[in-house]
Amino acid sequence: MRNLTRNRSLVAGASVIALLVIMGISQSVLERTAAAQNKGAVQAPRFEVDPLWPKPLPNHWILGSTIGVWVDTDDHVWIIHRSTATLGNNEKTLETKQGECCAGAPPILEFDQEGNLLRHWGGPGQGYEWPDSNHGIFIDYKGNVWIGGNGAPDSHILKFTKDGKFLLQVGKKGARRKEGASAGNQEGQVAGFVGGSNDPVSFGRVAKIFVDAKANEAYVADGYLNKRVAVLDADSGKIKRFWGAYGNKPDDTPLPPYNPSNPPAQQFYNPVHCADMSVDRLIYVCDRVGDRLQVFTPEGKFVKEQWYEKNTLNAGSVWDIAFSKDAQQKYIFMADGVNEKVKIIDRQTLEELTTFGDGGRYPGQFYGVHSIAIDSKGNLYTTETYEGKRIQRFLYKGMAPVTKMNQGVVWPARSTR
């Protein structure tokens, strides 16, 4: 009987060993198969939200609608927001002396890589006209800070030092005012103001500025009222050239509401929301409401275009872009503030490879993701407008095979300890 029991134990043990061997072989085969499949799969950058960046602001400060972000050559992160103007009464009781919290932070904030607040400034001052509704921020190769504005009378841009010293105003506030003018049907068109897309001096509610170091030229996404890209001398502010969609002469004739079934509009919709230059000196223009990205030479010659989430209506899908930090800038990262995602795009083909994010309030989710920027390590920074009112950092985690079109919310992996 003992021998029978022992034999059964030996058989059982051998079976377990055989099973483990089979499982090991199967696992090895699966791993090799997956590796082979991944080897031929499309690769894309992978990200993970950093829920602890930045650090809390001092003085009970909070952010309003946050509508611009840029990373300077020191890897410092700059944002611009609308502060008190976009805070509800229950959010700013410190200002109204009705409670201890909170107050709107100054409009322009600078953070280091650890999330510490380094500098803060902005607002009305002598010698310049602060925008009614500031919009977009850029730090140029000389360390100067550029901002635009999309308030009703904002037809100018401003340049400051990093410490907030005023340097230059281009354009005159209120230049687009025309008594009796009716409101248009697109975002930014307000009664009493008309477009001036062929104006050689002033703008029409500028969304964003990009400065080309090689030519010392500023590219202006102009804008929420005008329908053009304007290029100016970055020192004098003199406008040198401008163009509309497809390189056409800009035309301020109101467009019908965007309809994806209609032929492509031959002018930009409002707003023209970005105009950024790549390393090979191509200008990528965000036609936000038109759901399209158009590409031009620096002289305004049309090169190509692509649509994204083409059936997106209202505020559109193409809000802002940033280029990857490899030498060829292989990828474009695009903020989509209606569908609440960041798109990862092959820059050469303009093909969308994958997306991450979703609507919501938790880390890694978005509410009105508006602007996007990248640091030297490849980390992404996004800001949110409307009631989003925040900046988020997404850490670059290397390249990975694309296994699905939408990665969802890219939270950090939970610890197994």
Predicted region positions:
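N-terminal secretory signal peptides that target proteins for export/translocation
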Residues: 1-7
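Eukaryotic scaffold repeat domains enriched in small/polar residues
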Residues: 7-417
